[in-house]
Each structure stands twice: as C-alpha cells, then as structure tokens.
C-alpha cells in the first residue's frame, strides 16, 4: 500500500523516521565494537538525542545536503504541533529534531532507501569526526 506523505502530519513522519534512522546507528555501534548495553545506549545518544539530531539537521542545511523537498518536509516536521513534551532538552531543539526525523520518515514512505542510507552515513560521519555535538 502506497501512503501519500503529503497527507501525513509532521509528527507521523517523525514517528516513522525515528524508527528508520536508529537501526543505522545501532548497526554502526555494533560494527564499531560496542557490545555492552550500557555502552551502546551511551554512545547512541551522540547520534540520536534531540540535541544531536538538531545539530545534524542544522549542519545539513548549512552545507546544502538536503534537497528542496527534504527541506520542506523538515520544516513541516519542525512546525508540527506535538502534545508530548521534550525530555532532556528545550522545546526549540525538540522541534528541530522532530523535523530531522520527519525527513527520514518521508524518505521511507517514498521508498528512497539509497537516500536514507546516504543521509544516515553522512550523519554518522559528522558525529564520528566531531563535526557535531550532542551537547548544545
């Protein structure tokens, strides 16, 4: 069944996007030699926390990594009204990270697996090379 991403709100796209992005991070951490649950969780936060995702999407925009459609989807996710409150971060950072996740949800729904992998690998590289920080 094909779902029209344009009919979905940004929160729904972000919900899916969160599930799409995280397996790339988990696989990367396992392949990097982390095997203990506490270490895996600790290191994952450098890639998947709201602060990290906000920093990554801001860098994507600065470096013009995103397509115009992806930028539009990001803005839709960022501007979506959420009834959940941010844990461990401020509302602005949380909303920006929601936009980040919405991009991955959009790419999944439009069956752009290669683009998902490309952006996920780009994000991993940025974090691994210290270009972004999960601390803001």
Swiss-Prot record:
InterPro entries hit by this protein: Mini3_fam, RNase_III_dom, RNase_III_sf
Organism ancestry: Bacteria, Bacillati, Bacillota, Bacilli, Lactobacillales
Function field: Involved in correct processing of both the 5' and 3' ends of 23S rRNA precursor. Processes 30S rRNA precursor transcript even in absence of ribonuclease 3 (Rnc); Rnc processes 30S rRNA into smaller rRNA precursors.
Superkingdom in the source lineage: Bacteria
GO cellular component terms, A-Z: cytoplasm
Compartments (UniProt record): Cytoplasm
Any Gene Ontology biological process: rRNA processing
A GO molecular-function descriptor: ribonuclease III activity
Residue positions of the active site: 18
Cofactor: Mg(2+)
Gene name as annotated: mrnC
Subunit structure comment from the entry: Homodimer.
SS bond partners: none
Protein name: Mini-ribonuclease 3
Enzyme Commission number(s) of this protein: 3.1.26.-
A Pfam family the protein falls into: Ribonuclease_3
Family, per entry: Belongs to the MrnC RNase family.
Keywords: Cytoplasm, Endonuclease, Hydrolase, Magnesium, Nuclease, Ribosome biogenesis, RNA-binding, rRNA processing, rRNA-binding
